[in-house]
Amino acid sequence: MDKNLNLWDMSTFIQQYGALTADHPTHTPEDSPQTVPSPRSSSAHSPEIQELRSLQETRPARLGARSQSRSSKHGLQQCSSSPSDESFRLHAELAAWCERVETKPSLLAKLGCCAAPPVVGDHREQRREAMERIMRCLDAGQAGTQLTLRDLNLSQLPPGLHRLAHLRDLDVADNVNLTRLPEDLSLCKHLERINADGCSIAALPSKIGALKNLSEISLAFNELRTLPDSIGQCSSLTTIVVPGCKINKLPASLANLTQLKKLDVAANIELSELSPHMNLDDVAVHSTQTRLGLMHRIFKAPTFDPETRQRLSYQASALRDRWAALSHHLSPQARARVDQMREGASTTLSSQDHKASTAWKTATEKVSSWAEEGAPITLDRIFKLNQLLLPEGDDDNDPIGGQLRKVGIQAAPSNTWTECRYPPPETLKDEMAKFSGWLEHSEQQAHARDALGHIEFAAQLHQRLVSLHPFDDANGRTARLAMDWALQRHGLPPAPPVGEASRLPASFLGGKRVSPEKVVLETLEGIATVMNQVHQ
């Protein structure tokens, strides 16, 4: 068969294979001539051939609908396609696409024009349904902004999607045999949202960067190992959702996406790096079940304008001087009120848990002795604090103190598995190493800090420990005792939490961020509250 046969040119088709309607004479046993339909004749009435004829007959009428304009200067005629002609072209492309996977082998397949269709998965591909939806979208004109091809068991996307001039939203999710998004998808210039969750996509168009209006792309649970470099050219992109894939590397070009607000790469267990040039200040990164250690990149030192810093510095110095005058003459009742305020920040201590209360008192005494000695705050001592707060018990299920957690956890109350998740356990070793480096550097600068500087360090220490949540339990109590240690070592009183920022100072990669300035201000307020309690 001629492989270059134009399936839509019926004259060529007939010349190649003969008239499909011709009847061939034959003879009965009595040698009486009869006419019986040939196999080709019977096939001529199949839906496929009828559609071919219909297209061939309507083509001249459609082509005649073209609008023409003549240039008098050059004597040349220019033709532009009318909507009806565009519809014909798209219909022809889709009809040919459908021919390749009919439920029954088509006549063209019998003749060798295309292979007989395999069954894809447990069901046939619903290409006819996809074709009808596309044509309805085209016929809708400006209202045809959405196209849903979800769960049609497609192994490839239909051709001609770029002919849908008003397409904004494309949903091809749950086509489990779909392995790639075609290159010509980058021609859909007005596309804003793509949902291809739950497929088997291993490759995106290399020129996807041409989609300048694309704002959201969701490719959860696919076979992707990376994203094309050109995605960094999608200047309107705000959301990238690719959890549950096989991504082990992300392009550095993501740093160019200045509008990006959400990057969900959860459950890509081989992913360990993100471009250092990517600004995470305004990007929520969902990194559960990855090896991405990014918390050190969202921790910031507090910054105040000169006027505010001068005012706060004066206030901090005044509080330190007042505490120095009062701390050696506190009555037992005043000390009890301060301790009650500190314990009230913990739901565990507030629940009258005798074992936890005893451990808290032991750890508090240890912090006081370290503060009096002027002992530097180190990572080893913070681990020791957590161990004191979680003494070994008789129950094998009790959390073990002083060890990094090995499970993923989230803040409570929370109804999301990404937005309020603490760092993955796979990243904690590296995260704590970076935290230890920050501690050492801060300790070296301690002699140069004023009272406000000591409060800023204590507030950051509290926030960073709570945000990392490195232990199985007692993370909040460990962080508060570490903060009190940092304050008491420099002649300041403990600072019980008094506001939302100081009670819940954690910042999350995937969601809420608490400014360090707010934590510092509420730490100052907590110190002032202690002073008021002492005066009563």
Curated annotation (Swiss-Prot):
It comes from the Bacteria. Keywords: Host cell membrane, Host membrane, Leucine-rich repeat, Membrane, Nucleotidyltransferase, Repeat, Secreted, Transferase, Virulence. One of its GO terms (molecular function) is nucleotidyltransferase activity. Its EC number is 2.7.7.-. Residues 22-84 are annotated as: Disordered. LRR repeats lie at residues 140-164, 165-189, 191-211, 212-234, 236-257, 258-282. Residues 377-533 form the Fido domain. Residues 31-45, 66-84 have a biased composition (Polar residues). Induction: Transcriptionally regulated by HrpG and HrpX. It is found in: Secreted; Host cell; Host cell membrane. It holds the Pfam family Fic. It catalyses: L-seryl-[protein] + UTP = O-(5'-uridylyl)-L-seryl-[protein] + diphosphate; L-threonyl-[protein] + UTP = uridylyl-L-threonyl-[protein] + diphosphate. SMART domains: LRR_TYP. Residues 48-60 have a biased composition (Basic and acidic residues). The keyword Secreted applies. One of its GO terms (cellular component) is membrane. Disruption phenotype: Mutant becomes virulent on Col-0 plants. Mutant still induces disease on the Kashmir ecotype. NCBIfam families: XopAC (NF041381). In the C-terminal section; belongs to the fic family. Functions both as a virulence and an avirulence gene in Arabidopsis. Causes disease on the Kashmir (Kas) ecotype, but not on Columbia (Col-0) ecotype. Acts by directly uridylylating the conserved phosphorylation sites in the activation loop of a number of host receptor-like cytoplasmic protein kinases (RLCK), including BIK1, RIPK, PBL1 and PBL2, preventing the activation of these kinases and subsequent signal transduction. In susceptible Arabidopsis plants, uridylylation of BIK1 inhibits the PAMP-triggered immunity (PTI) signaling cascade and thereby promotes bacterial virulence. Interacts with several members of the Arabidopsis RLCK VIIa subfamily. The LRR domain, the Fic/Fido domain and the uridylylation activity are required for avirulence function on Col-0. This is Uridine 5'-monophosphate transferase. It comes from Xanthomonas campestris pv. campestris (strain 8004).
